[in-house]
């Protein structure tokens, strides 16, 4: 049972999913996962809690995860996001981690958290069954999400993500490991990060591109509204269709790199401001990367 009154001086202290749901859904509350727990793992494997069919609302002012890991959760709700913030007030979520998360919510993105900042959080081992949404995050036209020092390791399954990875979410110092399909219509463009910034980010994994009709489908990494900055993309891009696909990084405000060895046949890649295409070997050479303006510190 949760303790505390939910104020900044006396936050709610929680250690169960039910108490987390109640406390985090309380507008303006301050919430902490139990900092003194002997174990900080909430393992739902075999639990009667699964499948979870109700989204997890994060409407509190602050949720401090204190390193807690929520594992083996199965979320099944075809018409809702997994984590949602419905408040326009600023919400801070930090150091909370989800492992082995299965989401069957194909009409919605994993997160919908406008006005929320995630710091030091992770979503790993995520299997996402998607068909009609952004893969990861959706802010709003008036309030954007922010992710700092976060990790996203996700596998999307389905006919193809039609909208991209995220919209209206700024990522700084984040790591992505993605395995996903992405579908674009012939003669039109699809955008992986729409109205979203990528600064000091690393993206790895594989994206299987598919063009539905002749007419040169176009895939934009960003749309230029918020260009990349000092980001590194080592993603295996493949073309699973018979039609040519154009890959456009658009532009960056500071040197960003794309590993060209990982771009498959049937994909034509284009230049952009401050974009450097590098070989796999060059991408591992700190001296070379520094020489082209991509800052790397050897350790």
Model-derived regions: residue spans:
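Surface-exposed repetitive/solenoidal architectures
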Residues: 1-299
């Amino acid at each position: 049972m949760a303790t505390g009154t939910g104020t900044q001086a006396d936050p709610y202290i929680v250690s169960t999913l039910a108490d987390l749901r109640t406390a985090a859904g309380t507008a303006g509350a301050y919430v902490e996962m139990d900092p003194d727990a002997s174990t900080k793992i909430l393992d739902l494997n075999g639990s009667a809690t699964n499948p979870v069919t109700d989204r997890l609302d994060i409407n509190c002012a602050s949720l401090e995860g204190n390193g807690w890991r929520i594992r083996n959760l199965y979320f099944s709700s075809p018409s809702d996001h997994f984590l949602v913030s419905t408040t326009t007030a600023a919400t801070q979520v930090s150091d909370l981690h989800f492992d082995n998360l299965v989401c069957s919510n194909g009409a919605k993105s994993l997160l919908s958290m406008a006005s929320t900042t995630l710091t030091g959080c992770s979503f790993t081992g995520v299997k996402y069954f998607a068909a009609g949404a952004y893969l990861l995050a959706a802010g709003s036209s008036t309030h954007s999400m922010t992710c700092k020092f976060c990790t996203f390791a996700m596998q999307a399954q389905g006919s193809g993500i039609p909208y991209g990875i995220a919209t209206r979410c700024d990522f700084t110092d984040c790591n992505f490991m993605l395995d996903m399909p992405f579908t674009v219509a012939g003669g039109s463009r699809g955008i992986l990060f729409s109205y979203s910034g990528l600064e000091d980010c690393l993206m790895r994994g594989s994206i299987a591109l598919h063009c539905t009709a002749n007419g040169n489908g176009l895939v934009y990494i960003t749309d230029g509204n918020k260009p990349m900055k000092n980001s590194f993309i080592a993603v295996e891009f493949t073309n699973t269709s018979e039609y040519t696909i154009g890959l456009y990084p658009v532009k960056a405000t500071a040197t960003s790199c794309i590993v060209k060895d990982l771009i498959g046949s049937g994909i034509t890649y284009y230049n952009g401001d401050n974009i450097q295409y590098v070989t796999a070997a060059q991408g591992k050479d700190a001296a070379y990367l520094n020489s082209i303006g991509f800052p790397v510190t050897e350790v």
